[in-house]
Amino acid sequence: MPQGKNSQSVGRIGELSVELELTGRNWLVGNFNSNIQNAAVYDLFAVKKNIKRLLRVKSYSLWNNDFGTIQYTAKKNGEIFLDLDEKNKDDFVILCGVREGKVKEYFIIPTQIVSKELKKSNKIYHQGKKRDGTKRKITSHRALFLQESKDHYWCGWRRKWNKYHNNWKLLEN
């Protein structure tokens, strides 16, 4: 990533790229953040024919060998996503892997799936111990690693989520 890129610019690149990608696929796209600075729940909404989608865009930096980490901060109640309703099938996360100022990969995933996997990964992580045998400290940090690494549940998500990789058609189902 070029020097000077910060998490805000990586996030903005992802958001703009999703807007452009959807517009090119004949979706009408609106940005909640254009009216509400850094909207708390959704970033974008998209409409195509009779289909509507509420989108939470999450960008992450891609490093050497496409290493990338999807990171969230859980709320005090343990939830990652505000206003997540299991009955709402219109709620999606679009993950954007950014390298050198451009999105190189997208994952289009129902928000409930991302929430479930982040919680499960965090639970499994805390069942293990640190190298010195002591318990791992419980924090609000949640992470999934895209790259393969050892045999940890929280690694290898590019492979595990392959069916969501650049699969924009999921928004139309």
Task: List the predicted regions and their residue ranges.
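Mixed-charge (Asp/Glu-Lys/Arg
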Residues: 1-40, 45-173
